[in-house]
Amino acid sequence: MSRYRGPRLKIVRRLGDLPGFTNKIQKRQASTQNKGKKTAKKRLSQYSIRLQEKQKLRYNYGVTERQLLLYVRKARRIKGSTGQILLQQLEMRLDNIIYRLGMAPTIANARQLVNHGHIVVNDRIVTIPSYRCKPKDIISVRNNSTSRNVITNNLSFSDSRLPPHLSFKKESLVALVNGLVDRQWIPLNINELLVVEYYSRMA
């Protein structure tokens, strides 16, 4: 299954706010709560609930079905909480790190920056969005006016809060990966254990 390229608000209305997918936030009106008193909400099956959580993860991080399955399989082979390890793997993708630094408004935009050769990791240009960043990696912007202007412009509109596992000097456009992200710093309303359960027969 390829990446979704349709209307983003349609997905947000169905799954809830997905910060990495779109910076547009779902509007919750009081009138919709009143309607809920008249119309009973359809009860979801356990499978549907797991599917919904899986879709949240896939859309938010912009990965394909096959990629997500591979991440789950890798997480299962690592000692610890499979759900948290899965989230850490997705959070350490280069496109997500660029988004978290505020260099891009969404992960999709961050992916384009990487694809177009604007991003440097440890003094080497990296054009693979799924590149897995590691603690002590130094991430910077390619030293040309086009790259620096694009990212400086994005930063001027960014209000993202920098998580403690990242350090960033905006003046020089140089960032450092301090370590792995803690679960509490992942701004996504999701039950990652249900995602692991969804893939339990496949992974």
From Swiss-Prot:
CDD domains: S4
Any single GO BP term: ribosomal small subunit biogenesis
A Pfam cross-reference name: Ribosomal_S4
Subcellular location: Plastid, Chloroplast
Keyword tRNA processing annotated: no
Record domain S4 RNA-binding: where: 92-150
One GO CC term, this protein: chloroplast
Main localization, broad class: plastid
One MF term in the entry's GO annotations: structural constituent of ribosome
Assigned keywords, A-Z: Chloroplast, Plastid, Ribonucleoprotein, Ribosomal protein, RNA-binding, rRNA-binding
UniProt similarity note: Belongs to the universal ribosomal protein uS4 family.
Subunit and partners: Part of the 30S ribosomal subunit. Contacts protein S5. The interaction surface between S4 and S5 is involved in control of translational fidelity.
Role of this protein: One of the primary rRNA binding proteins, it binds directly to 16S rRNA where it nucleates assembly of the body of the 30S subunit.
Protein's name according to its UniProt entry: Small ribosomal subunit protein uS4c
Organism: Chlorokybus atmophyticus (Soil alga)
